Structures are given as structure tokens and as C-alpha cells.
UniProtKB/Swiss-Prot annotation:
Gene name, Swiss-Prot/TrEMBL: tiaS
Protein name: tRNA(Ile2) 2-agmatinylcytidine synthetase TiaS
Family: Belongs to the TiaS family.
Gene Ontology annotations for the cellular component aspect, listed alphabetically: cytoplasm
A Gene Ontology molecular function term of the record: ATP binding
Keyword flag Ligase: yes
Entry keyword set: ATP-binding, Cytoplasm, Ligase, Nucleotide-binding, tRNA processing
Length: 459
């Protein structure tokens, strides 16, 4: 009997008060791997969607499990089981902006659902657009709303399902989860061991430690169930890196995800500022049009132009070294700016929130100076229009003297610039990943060594 491929997506199974979508999926996957011998065709996928949309979930990520079942009835049974488990998981939380959804797409993905996945990573997806897409896919989808009439999670679920990562860049993340009795307590992760791990595996892991503030970056804050997350290029490296970190609390579950994190997938190259629509992630080649100014809060603002249109660019205080570089820009410098377009407000127009800066050309600064007196060396003054210069000290005159052109050396070089480590968001690609991009992944490959329960590898 031919098996059927199923893509099951999960979104918004968390709240600001607790819970975590990846934790829920990890918990149910432990049961399915142990008891049902579920046959995955990919690592669990953690898909980060456009971080600029106004109604994003925390982290704006959704999770997808891609697996094979014997028949349609088995797929429905798994969906019902996931739904019941999610209701129980969310029973202790309530939040009015909460739109939890579990959805399923059966069979090979259509070009339409792949398109919506591609678009959702860098652009705005209105709910009515998603409804129109799902109506055309109605014979291949089924979903469950965990809150009556709360449908926005459909966007995350089916966009993540459509973002397959078979011909786009990807990375991996190993996430370790906490025991329930430890949640809300300080995380027992040894900072020095994280620093040592970073030095050993720096080339193939991503943003483990911030040496400017001297603190680990792999441990989140707050009361969610995540103990730590180590991100990197390859699963085997993450396993070795994790084993080097000293942890002084139980870790009931850990799981490796394949993900679009740190790939700049949310940035789309645009031709001009006319395409810089609000909430869109963009990268665009422009010229600096104003001297950067520092405003209240330590943020730096400057204008850029494509020759016809203008837009503000903001380097916020947490970006650290990127903000300091932005302050050195001057009108006429040619740059490529990357970031999310923020909507206008009563105080400012649309603004690109700067994530990365590529300085293409630094315009020389020219200063015109009065010539010096050849007799005494004093700086001469104008003798009047068309009359040359005279020396105020010794009286020497030169009717043919002209201003001296002096080129001032800029304290700025062409190149790529990124923010301080603490300012990185999920999708932002560090410069050290340049040249490490991947562009292929098999349609079907059963992962191994990706899920542990009570420190035991499940197979």
C-alpha cells in the first residue's frame, strides 16, 4: 500500500504568560516516536515568518512535522490527538490575542501553498488572502481552531507548511527543554562552559555568547519552557556543542529542528524605494541624503534616497556597533540598507529599521581653505570678489591666489557591517555565515539522532 505524505503545522500554542509552540510539538513528538514509530521525512521544521508584521506571535515562528502515514484515517487520528493534547496544554493559559491553530496538508505541496510560504517570510499576508488560498486547496487541507473564531494562526500554520526549504538556505537548532518544576526559576546553565563551547565550535555555531556584555545568548529570559537553544550549520556539531555545556538541572526533552533562522530569508532585494512597502523586509541600494543624527534613547536616524524618493533609516541603540558606524555616514555615500519597513506615525514617516549595512562607496569629504601667505605663513583673507587674497599679518597680496582644495580622510571604509550580537533577531544572518549558504535539501530523508527523552536517544 502506498503511503501518504502529511505536513502538520502548529502555530501560536503559547502566550506571553507561558507555554511554547516548539515545546508542545517536542512533547507530542516524543509520544509519537516512542509509541507510534512515526515515520518522519524531514527534521521537525521551525519556520520563522516575517518579524515585521503587527500581529505576530512571540518569535513569529511556526512548527511543521512532515511524515508518512498508511492512510487518510491515520492522519486524521493524529490530528485529533494533537488537538486534544493542545487543548490540555493551553488549559492553564488564556490570552485575548491568542490564535492557536493546528493544520494539516495531505500530499505533495502545490505551487500555490509554496508561494504563500515564500511570501509570508518577507511580506504581509492578510487573513482574507490566506482564506482564498485555502479555499483553492480545500481538498488537501484540514485544520482545527483551538479558540473559537480565532483564525489568524492559519497564516502561520499553512505558510510554514508551504516553506519547504528544499531549495533555500537553512540552519539547525538544538533546543533543550526544562522540567515543569524548574520553570520560572533561574536557568542552571554554566556561562563559562558556554564561552568555552563557543571558542571550540565558533565556526559552525551561531551567536552563542556576547563578548561585549559578557553573557550567554543561548539561554532565553522569562518563564517559558526552553532551557537553551544552540544554533548552527549541522546537527552533529550541535550535539557535540550541547555536550560541552554544563547544565545543573534536568533536561527531559531535547530536539533538533531544521530552520530558516539566520538566513536573511525575510529580506527581499528591491529595485527602488517605491517598492519599500510597510512591514516588508527589504534590501535596497541607495545614497545617504542627510547627516545622521542621534535622537533621544540613543537611536541614530538618517535619510537615504534612490534618486527620486526618500526614506528614513533607523539604527537603534541596541544595535551597538552598527549604530556607531551609521553615525559616520555622510550625504553622497552609496550604501545598501537591509531591514524591515516600519509604518509612519505622527512623528515620522515610513522608516527602515536597520539590520545590516553594506557600504559600497564612501564619498570623499572636500574642504576648501584660504591659501597661506608665502611670506609669513599666516592664513590669507579674501581681498574682494575677483581680487585674490591678502595677508592680514604682513599685508602681502596675490590677485591670482585661489582656495586650496583639501581632501579629508574618512574614518569609514567600504564593507559589510552588522549589529552587536545581542541585537540579532531570529532571521538575521551574521556576516560569518556569508559563503555558508545551502541551497538543496532532499524532498524525503528520514532524520536520525534528533530527539532525546530523559537523556535517551529515541529511534
Amino acid at each position: 500500500m502506498k503511503e501518504t505524505i502529511v505536513h502538520m503545522g502548529f502555530d501560536d500554542i503559547d502566550t506571553p504568560f507561558g507555554g511554547c509552540t516548539t515545546h508542545f510539538v517536542a512533547s507530542i513528538l516524543v509520544k509519537w516516536v516512542k509509541d507510534r514509530r512515526i515515520k518522519l521525512i524531514d527534521y521537525p521544521n521551525l519556520i520563522r515568518l516575517n518579524p515585521g508584521v503587527p500581529w505576530k506571535t512571540r518569535g513569529n515562528g511556526a512548527v511543521v512535522l512532515r511524515f508518512k502515514v498508511k492512510n487518510y484515517d491515520e492522519a486524521i487520528k493524529l490530528l485529533e490527538e494533537a488537538y486534544d493534547e493542545a487543548l490540555e496544554y493551553l488549559g492553564k493559559y488564556h490570552h485575548p490575542q491568542h490564535h492557536p491553530v493546528i493544520g494539516m496538508y495531505i500530499g505533495g505541496l502545490s505551487e500555490r501553498i509554496k508561494w504563500i510560504g515564500w511570501k509570508a517570510v518577507h511580506d504581509l499576508i492578510p487573513l482574507d488572502l490566506m482564506h482564498r488560498v485555502l479555499e483553492k486547496e480545500k481538498n488537501k487541507i484540514i485544520y482545527k481552531l483551538l479558540r473559537k473564531d480565532k483564525k489568524r494562526g492559519l497564516i502561520g500554520v499553512f505558510s510554514a507548511i508551504g516553506y519547504r526549504m528544499t531549495n533555500t538556505d537553512y540552519t539547525y537548532e538544538l533546543i533543550a527543554y526544562r522540567s515543569e518544576e524548574y520553570i520560572d526559576k533561574p536557568r542552571q546553565v554554566n556561562a563559562e562552559s558556554v564561552k568555552y563551547m563557543d571558542k571550540v565550535f565558533h565556526n559552525d555555531t551561531i551567536l552563542n555568547y556576547d563578548y561585549e556584555t559578557n553573557r550567554p545568548l543561548i539561554t532565553p529570559h522569562g518563564g517559558d519552557p526552553v532551557l537553551l537553544g544552540i544554533r548552527g550549520e549541522y546537527p552533529d556539531v550541535l550535539i557535540k556543542a550541547y555536550n560541552m555545556v554544563k547544565i545543573n538541572e534536568p533536561v527531559p526533552i531535547r530536539l533538533i529542528y531544521r530552520t530558516n533562522q539566520h538566513t536573511d530569508a525575510h529580506l527581499r532585494r528591491i529595485n527602488n524605494l517605491g517598492e519599500a512597502f510597510i512591514y516588508r523586509g527589504v534590501r535596497v541600494r541607495v545614497w545617504v541624503a542627510s547627516i545622521p543624527k542621534r535622537i533621544m534613547g540613543g537611536h541614530v536616524i538618517f535619510k537615504v534616497t534612490d534618486g527620486r524618493r526618500f526614506i528614513d533609516v533607523a539604527a537603534y541603540e541596541p544595535t551597538g556597533k552598527l549604530r556607531r558606524i551609521a553615525e559616520k555616514l555622510r550625504p553622497g555615500d552609496e550604501v545598501e540598507v537591509m531591514g524591515i519597513v516600519r509604518p509612519q506615525s505622527s512623528k515620522h514617516g515610513p522608516t527602515i529599521n536597520l539590520e545590516k549595512l553594506h557600504i559600497i562607496m564612501v564619498k570623499p569629504l572636500i574642504k576648501l581653505e584660504n591659501p597661506r601667505c608665502p611670506r609669513c605663513g599666516a592664513r590669507m583673507k579674501s581681498a574682494g570678489r575677483g581680487k585674490g587674497y591678502k595677508c592680514p599679518k604682513c599685508g602681502y597680496r596675490d590677485p591670482n591666489a585661489k582656495k586650496i582644495v583639501r581632501v579629508i580622510k574618512r574614518d569609514l571604509e567600504p564593507g559589510w557591517y552588522e549589529p552587536s550580537p545581542r541585537a540579532f533577531k531570529h532571521l538575521m544572518k551574521p556576516l560569518k555565515r556569508f559563503g555558508k549558504e545551502k541551497n538543496h535539501y532532499p524532498e524525503e530523508i528520514e532524520p536520525s539522532n534528533f530527539i532525546w527523552y530523559n537523556n535517551m536517544l529515541l529511534k
